[in-house]
Amino acid sequence: MNWVFLCLAILFEVAGTVSMKLSSGFTKLIPSLLLIFFYGGSLFFLTLTLKSIDVSVAYAVWSGMGIVLITVVGFLFFQEHVSVMKVISIGLIIAGVVSLNLIEHVAVSEPVHKSGQYK
């Protein structure tokens, strides 16, 4: 369930960012209210996520995947330019998120002494 909460946090964060763009600097009421709702929801689900996923992993996945998704949304819906360098950078973000997930699974299976040293 913890990864479901993290996915919801990411989706709410992306919806909040889209609402921010549509609010035109808080000059449009409905997008401004949606911005507050979606960012509040994102932080709510991120907080639930942190009960069972390390903050370093959860925050990296949340921010990294948020960047990836909002870049795609910007390209598809706001006609934002996507350069080759941006695509390479997004690929590196995805590789980092995958690496963090793999490391977390390895770390869970390796017990640690209270001193912080591996057995």
Swiss-Prot record:
Its main location: membrane. Keywords: Cell membrane, Membrane, Transmembrane, Transmembrane helix, Transport. The chain crosses the membrane at residues 3-23, 29-49, 58-78, 87-107. GO terms for cellular component: plasma membrane. GO terms for molecular function: transmembrane transporter activity. It holds the Pfam family Multi_Drug_Res. SUPFAM superfamilies: Multidrug resistance efflux transporter EmrE (SSF103481). PANTHER family: MULTIDRUG TRANSPORTER EMRE, SMR FAMILY PROTON-DEPENDENT DRUG EFFLUX TRANSPORTER SUGE. This is Uncharacterized membrane protein YvaE. It comes from Bacillus subtilis (strain 168). The gene is yvaE.
